[in-house]
Amino acid sequence: MTILTHTLGFPRVGLRRELKKAQESYWAGNSTREALLAVGRELRARHWEQQKQAGIDLLPVGDFAWYDHVLTTSLLLGNVPARHQNNDGSMDIDTLFRIGRGRAPTGEPAAAAEMTKWFNTNYHYIVPEFSKGQQFRLTWTQLLEEVDEALALGHKIKPVLLGPVTYLWLGKVKGEPFDRLTLLKDILPVYQHVLAELAKRGIEWVQIDEPALVLELPQAWLDAFKPAYDALAGQVKLLLTTYFEGVTPNLDTIIALPVQGLHVDLIHGKDDVAELHQRLPVDWLLSAGLINGRNVWRADLTEKYAQINALVGKRALWVASSCSLLHSPIDLSVETRLDTEVKSWFAFALQKCGELALLRDALNSGETAALEEWSAPIQARRHSRRVHNAAVEKRLAAITAQDSQRENPYEVRAEAQRARFKLPAWPTTTIGSFPQTTEIRGLRLDFKKGNLDANNYRTGIAEHIKQAIIEQERLGLDVLVHGEAERNDMVEYFGEHLDGFVFTQNGWVQSYGSRCVKPPVVIGDISRPAPITVEWAKYAQSLTDKPVKGMLTGPVTILCWSFPREDVTRETIAKQIALALRDEVADLEAAGIGIIQIDEPALREGLPLRRSDWDAYLEWGVEAFRINAAVAKDETQIHTHMCYCEFNDIMDSIAALDADVITIETSRSDMELLESFEAFDYPNEIGPGVYDIHSPNVPSVEWIEALLKKAAQRIPAQRLWVNPDCGLKTRGWPETRAALANMVKAAHNLRQAK
C-alpha cells in the first residue's frame, strides 16, 4: 500500500496577488471579462504545476474561487438570491460578484449577501441565503470546467466539493422562518448530478468537505449525514474531509457513512491515531492531516513520522495538509529580507508541499535521514535567544491576581472620571481612525522606500494629526482622537514596535474577495523595547484642551490576527502582549492621556469551535485584557471597542473585562444588540454605534436621534455615549464630516430635550 500525498486546497490569489489585481481591474471597468478569466486559468495551471513539482501526487481541483468557495457552491446549486438574479435566469461571473459585493460591471446593484468568518479562521465566506420552497439545479459548471482543464494538462487530480450538510449549516434563512435542514433532500440531486459528471470523466476520488462534523452539532443535524451520504454513495470514492478540530466526539456518526476514506486534522484536533485506526472500517483510507495549513512554521518531520509510522502497511494511508493551504502564504523562497536563521524556521504553502513529499518518501522507504536534516533548524530554534527572553518569562510567571484588578470598582472610578473630564450628557467621540487619504498613504510609502527622511516624515504625520484635531474641534466632538495617520494596520503597527515579531514581504493570505492581509509572525517572547504610541498621543493632546484618547490594539486581537508561535500556548502569547501593552498604558497615563482605548474586535471570533471549550479561552482572554488595563488609575478612563457580533452568549465575559466604556457596532441591527446588555443589566457605560461606517451614506440627524432614543429605552441615558460603529479609515473626508456633524447635532438635540 503505497502512501500518497495530497493537499486540501492551495492559495488562489497568486504570489504577487495577481487575482486581486485582475478582479479589481475588472470591477473598475479597466479590463475585460476575458482578461480576468485568462488570469484565473493561468493561476490554476501554475499552481497545479507548482504543487506537482513539489511532490503532491493528487492535485486539488475546485479549490479555486473567483470570490469565495462557499459562494461558488451556492452558484453550483443554483442558489442565487432573487435580488441578484439575471432576468433570463442565467448565471455568469457578474452574478457571483453581485452576491459578494453588491455590484458588478453588469446587472443591477443590490445589497450584498452577508459575510462572516469561516469557522475560527481569518478567512470570510459569503453566507448562503435560504427560503422556503426553494429550488436547486446545476447551472454553474465551474468545477467541471476546471476538472476538464486539469485533465487536459495531464494531471492526476482529486476534485473538491463543499459537502451538503455543512453547506446548509453555514447558511441563513431569509423571509418566512423554517428549518433549513429540510432543504437537504432538494440539494442532494444536484450533488448526485455533479458526482455522476465526475465519474464520467474517470475521476476515482472526490474530496467532500464536511468541517461541520468537528462541531457540537444538534442531534438532528448529525442524523442528517447518513441519509445524505446514502444518496451520494456509489458513483466515485468519497474522501470525507474534516478540519480545524478533531472528529472523535462525532466518530460514531462518521463510521456509519458509506464513504471510502476520512481526512482528519491532526494539528488542531486531539484525535488519537491508534484509536482512529482501531475504530475506522478496515477498508477505509485514512488521510492524515500532519502538516499545519494555517501557520508558517517548518514542521518537525521526525515527530510527524513517529506519529503515523505505526499505521504503515496496516491500512491505506495518505499524508496531507491539516486543512486547505489557503490560510498560508505561497512561497518562502521569494522572501529576501528575512535573515537566514528566521527563514530556516518557516515553511509556506509550497514548502509544506515539499514537507509532505519528504514524509511520504520516508514512510514508504523507512529511510529518515532527510527528515532529520529538514528538522534540524527546529531543534536550533528551541534554544535560540531570538525565541526566549528570560526577563519576559520571569515577569509572566510573577503575575498575580492583583495585576488584573483595577484599584476600585467601576462606581468609584466613574465618580473620579466625571470629576476629571466634566463631559456633557450624550458625550460624542469616534472610534479612532480618520480617513487614510492618498497623501497619508503616500507619505508612509515614501518613508518606507527611503524616499523621505525621518524628519520630513514626522513633520508630515504631525501635520495630519493637527488637521484631525482641528476637524474634530470644528465639529464639536467631546472626546477626540489623533486619527492614526502613522498606522498602516492596527495589528501590524504594534507588531513592528514589539520585540518577538517579524514581518514578511509577500506573506499575503486571502481574507475575502480581493482583500488580502499580511499577518505578522510571532517568533519569540514578546516585549516592548520603547513606548509606541505615547509621542503622537502627547502631541495631539498638546493641540487641544479636550481629552484625546490613547489608542491601543488589545492583546487577544493582536494574537488572533497574527501567525502565532506553536511552541507555547495562545494564552502565554496573549499575556506577554498584555504585559508589554500594560507598560504602554502606564506611559500614556504618565504623559497626561486620561482616556485610553484598548480595542478587542477579535475577542469573540477567537472562540474555540466547541462550546465546551469556551470557558477556558474566555477566562484567559479576559484576564489578558485586564492585565493590559488594570495598571490605570481610577481617574483614567479605559475604553474598549468590539466589532459587530453576538454578545448574548458571552455577556459575563464582556462585563468581566471591566472597561469603563465599551463601544460596539449596533446601527445595522437597529440597536437590537443592546438587548443583550439590557437583559444582563450591564453596569458600565456603552457607546452604541449610531451609523454604519462601511457605507458612504450620510445618516440624517433625525435617524441618529431615533436610534439614540431607542438605545435610551434599554440603557440609562447617563451611561450612553454617541459614536460611529467603527473607525473611519476607509471613508472619505466629505462624508465623514457630514456624518459626524449630524451625529454631534443629534447629541446636542437630546441634551436640550432633557
Swiss-Prot record:
Record-given protein name: 5-methyltetrahydropteroyltriglutamate--homocysteine methyltransferase
Enzyme class: transferase
Source taxonomy: Bacteria, Pseudomonadati, Pseudomonadota, Gammaproteobacteria, Enterobacterales
Residues that bind Zn(2+): 641, 643, 665, 726
Keyword terms: Amino-acid biosynthesis, Metal-binding, Methionine biosynthesis, Methyltransferase, Repeat, Transferase, Zinc
UniProt GO BP: methionine biosynthetic process; methylation
Cofactor note text: Binds 1 zinc ion per subunit.
Catalysed transformations (reactions): 5-methyltetrahydropteroyltri-L-glutamate + L-homocysteine = tetrahydropteroyltri-L-glutamate + L-methionine
Alphabetical list of Pfam families matching this protein: Meth_synt_1, Meth_synt_2
Protein residues bound to L-homocysteine: 431-433, 484, 599
Catalytic residues, chain numbering: 694 (proton donor)
Source species of the chain: Salmonella choleraesuis (strain SC-B67)
Any GO MF annotation of the entry: 5-methyltetrahydropteroyltriglutamate-homocysteine S-methyltransferase activity
Necessary cofactors: Zn(2+)
